[in-house]
Swiss-Prot record:
Its EC number is 4.6.1.18. Substrate binds at residues 35, 38, 69-73, 94, 113. It is found in: Secreted. Endonuclease that catalyzes the cleavage of RNA on the 3' side of pyrimidine nucleotides. Acts on single-stranded and double-stranded RNA. This is Ribonuclease pancreatic. Disulfide bonds join 54-112, 68-123, 86-138, 93-100.
Length: 156
C-alpha cells in the first residue's frame, strides 16, 4: 500500500514537471505586439531634437544588447492612434506580405540610425525627428501592429 502511494506520487510529480516544462517557456516570452510597443512606441514624449535621444532610448529599450540594431523608429503618438492604422489604407509590406497598413495622416516620429564607424558595445545613433506617414504590419486578435515596416512622406 505504501509502495503504491509512493509510486502514484512519483508519477504525479513527473507529470507536473512535464507540464511545467511545456508551459513555462511561453510564460516569459514577449508577444510580437508587446515587442512592437517596446521597440517603437514613445507616446509620452514629443520628437526630440536632442542628439542623445536615440542613444538613450535604444539602450533603455534593450536594442543594444549583444549587437547594435542598425535602424529603429520611435512613434510619438497615442498607442490607440497607432493601433488604428491597422484599419486604414492597406499596402504591400517590403517583404511582399499583404498585412501592412499606411496611416491616413502624418505622425510624429524619430528615426534612429547607427552612425558610421559605430561598433558594439559603443552603439552611437543619429537622431532625426520627422513628421511622416507610418506603415505597420498587423496581425492577431485583436488586430494590432507587430512590425514597423516604413515611414513615408506626405504625397500631397
Amino acid at each position: 500500500m505504501a509502495l503504491e502511494k509512493s509510486l502514484v506520487r512519483l508519477l504525479l510529480l513527473v507529470l507536473i514537471l512535464l507540464v511545467l516544462g511545456w508551459v513555462q517557456p511561453s510564460l516569459g516570452k514577449e508577444s510580437r505586439a508587446k515587442k512592437f510597443q517596446r521597440q517603437h512606441m514613445d507616446s509620452d514624449s514629443s520628437p526630440s531634437s536632442s542628439s542623445t535621444y536615440c542613444n538613450q532610448m535604444m539602450r533603455r529599450r534593450n536594442m543594444t544588447q549583444g549587437r547594435c540594431k542598425p535602424v529603429n523608429t520611435f512613434v510619438h503618438e497615442p498607442l490607440v492612434d497607432v493601433q488604428n492604422v491597422c484599419f486604414q489604407e492597406k499596402v504591400t509590406c517590403k517583404n511582399g506580405q499583404g498585412n501592412c497598413y499606411k496611416s491616413n495622416s502624418s505622425m510624429h516620429i524619430t528615426d534612429c540610425r547607427l552612425t558610421n564607424g559605430s561598433r558594439y558595445p559603443n552603439c552611437a545613433y543619429r537622431t532625426s525627428p520627422k513628421e511622416r506617414h507610418i506603415i505597420v504590419a498587423c496581425e492577431g486578435s485583436p488586430y494590432v501592429p507587430v512590425h514597423f515596416d516604413a515611414s513615408v512622406e506626405d504625397s500631397t
